[in-house]
Amino acid sequence: LRSAPVIVGSTLFYSATDSGRVFALDINSGCAKWVYTADSRLRSSIAYSEADESPVLVFSDSVGMIHTIDAKSGARIWIASGQASDNQGMLTGTPVVTGDKVIVPVSGSGVITGGNPNYECCENHGAVTALNLRTGERLWEYHTMPAAEYTGQVSSTGVKQRGPSGAPIWTTPTVDEKRGQVYVTTGENTSHP
């Protein structure tokens, strides 16, 4: 299990990540009110928001997409890429809804592929993207470090190395709405400094 449920009124919303489904369950009877099925496995917990007095659920999947669905019916509102423009990370933390924006944490995939002796380690890094809550349109993105370049070093197997890389964002961002700032914590360095 990767996700935590959200309870609103008498409904428990749960992201069954490996099955690619979101369930709306009645907390008194345990019966399903509706089930949403995505085209891929899901990765995050669910963020709940009452945008324009219409309750929505926001979450990510295993291929880097953000889903926004109607919390009352489970109907899809939109799906859009949560990836940064370099499209090299993956989404592991839960998106955050603040005002009319969805803030998306982007981690790195170099941690997974770094064990391959033929991989040109490492070229990706963490990022944060912001999407419009109503449309899914990309509003802005922030990268935790500059794009990696070849360092002139080679691995023990003769493969070119890149850097800097790393600083993935594995967790959920925190938003200071009063100051209009997003705070994230970053993970490990994945290449030589």
What are these regions, as identified by a protein language model?
Residues 1-2, 13, 29-38, 73-84, ...:
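Aromatic (tryptophan-biased) beta-strands that constitute blades/sheets of beta-rich domains
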Residues 24, 140-142, 183-184:
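Short beta-strand segments at enzyme active-site cores
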Residues 70, 123-137:
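Beta-propeller blade signature
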Residues 71, 114-117, 153:
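Short acidic, glycine/serine/threonine-rich loops at helix termini
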Residues 73, 106, 132-135, 146, ...:
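A generic secondary-structure signal for well-formed alpha-helical elements
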